Amino acid sequence: MSTFGKLFRVTTYGESHCKSVGCIVDGVPPGMSLTEADIQPQLTRRRPGQSKLSTPRDEKDRVEIQSGTEFGKTLGTPIAMMIKNEDQRPHDYSDMDKFPRPSHADFTYSEKYGIKASSGGGRASARETIGRVASGAIAEKFLAQNSNVEIVAFVTQIGEIKMNRDSFDPEFQHLLNTITREKVDSMGPIRCPDASVAGLMVKEIEKYRGNKDSIGGVVTCVVRNLPTGLGEPCFDKLEAMLAHAMLSIPASKGFEIGSGFQGVSVPGSKHNDPFYFEKETNRLRTKTNNSGGVQGGISNGENIYFSVPFKSVATISQEQKTATYDGEEGILAAKGRHDPAVTPRAIPIVEAMTALVLADALLIQKARDFSRSVVH
């Protein structure tokens, strides 16, 4: 499906080499200030051609709001946004009419629909995520205005090069409390806040690019100032919805929240997060945050933090022995312009999908609070 969310809903449209990509966002409350200037910064962070570490495809990715606002205010009606595809080269994909790319969606899309886009990855292309980022920027503004929510993602691993993300380490927890987007972006195109490994990550990507290959990595994201009570019991737990959102991003291959897989080797006596009463905020807090801000599927007011691994980009120009759709063995060396590592550009996409989940959860909780007030 191309629609995500229940009350705060987004439908994305477009393929890699069609005339435009974009989205329709429904459920945005009326009266909220909104212009293209609120959306463009995140699209600019996502756009290709930012450095030698990304694809050279030259897209400006300028957003145009088509409906749902008037005089800079939302009307409460669906908001349509369009971004033109300006640097199309469909001829780069002529060989892929015969060969499904290894580990790409060419084969599975063809099997599912009986047809596939002849240029690029179609809906499986990362160009589809432009609509996510545009709608996520609206969700972020809604969250910031309602609860001062902050969402910051950053790169913690490229290939074998990794920074510390030990959830039991006070230094890492301090980083989660203080990291900002300005700090992340100040580290250059790699977007890793640890200067001691950022340069090594750049060299790692350059090494694989030089070999006409690609490499994967990990994005970590933190959410601060989220209210308590968001998320549903059982099937729509907050971490389940976040996992759903993250695993819908192209090239993502997993999800872990809080202590994640690291927590399985820690006894409950050390893993539990004891409570204390904080007078300044007049509420219960936890002394540690191994739960990652979610207990029983519901936000507890602490930082939510999670990590998402992204696989090596499937489309590479290195020769690969593979087979055509007809089963004939052959050699594929993909043409086109592709990222040697998608992880740094995934940052605003992870932030956007996080914002969409949380905006939806906040609206659902507000509806529940209203119904409870009516009953009582």
Swiss-Prot record:
| InterPro entries according to UniProt | Chorismate_synth, Chorismate_synth_AroC_sf, Chorismate_synthase_CS
The protein's superkingdom reads: Eukaryota
One GO process term, biological-process aspect: chorismate biosynthetic process
N-acetylserine-modified residues are: S2
Protein name, entry field:
Chorismate synthase ARO2
Job of this protein: Bifunctional chorismate synthase and flavin reductase that catalyzes the conversion of 5-enolpyruvylshikimate 3-phosphate (EPSP) to form chorismate, which is the last common intermediate in the synthesis of the three aromatic amino acids phenylalanine, tyrosine and tryptophan. Also acts as a flavin reductase (FR) able to generate reduced flavin mononucleotide in the presence of NADPH.
Phylogenetic placement of the source organism: Eukaryota, Fungi, Dikarya, Ascomycota, Saccharomycotina
Null allele phenotype: Impairs sporulation, probably by blocking the biosynthesis of aromatic amino acids.
* Catalysed reaction, written as an equation: 5-O-(1-carboxyvinyl)-3-phosphoshikimate = chorismate + phosphate; FMNH2 + NADP(+) = FMN + NADPH + 2 H(+)
Q: What is its EC number?
A: 1.5.1.38, 4.2.3.5
What metabolic or biological pathway is this protein involved in? Metabolic intermediate biosynthesis; chorismate biosynthesis; chorismate from D-erythrose 4-phosphate and phosphoenolpyruvate: step 7/7
In terms of Gene3D superfamilies, this protein maps to: Chorismate synthase AroC (3.60.150.10)
Give me the gene this protein comes from.
Answer: ARO2
What does the UniProt keyword field contain?
Answer: Acetylation, Amino-acid biosynthesis, Aromatic amino acid biosynthesis, Flavoprotein, FMN, Lyase, Oxidoreductase, Stress response
Q: What subunit structure does UniProt give?
A: Homotetramer.
> Where in this protein does the record put region Disordered?
39-61
A GO cellular component term found in this entry reads:
cytosol
Instruction: Provide the induction entry.
Output: By amino acid starvation. Expression is increased in response to DNA replication stress.
Q: Which family does it belong to?
A: Belongs to the chorismate synthase family.
